[in-house]
Amino acid sequence: MKVKELVNKIADFGTSPHVYIQKEGIIGGGKPDDVVNTFGEMTVNSFIAAGRGQIKIFVK
């Protein structure tokens, strides 16, 4: 599954989802569109394998 697919699935659950992706000390977060534009084409497995990546998703 690609990161964008995961984000889109989670985004369906909330009216204002907020997604944070943390990777190797670099934190990118914000609206799902921002995250998808940056990391969306990576698969979740490759994202995590490339470094200690974490995907934190908060749904309001």
Write out the residue ranges for each language-model feature.
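N-terminal acidic leader/helix
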Residues: 1-20
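Detector for the mature cores of small, proteolytically processed
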Residues: 15-60
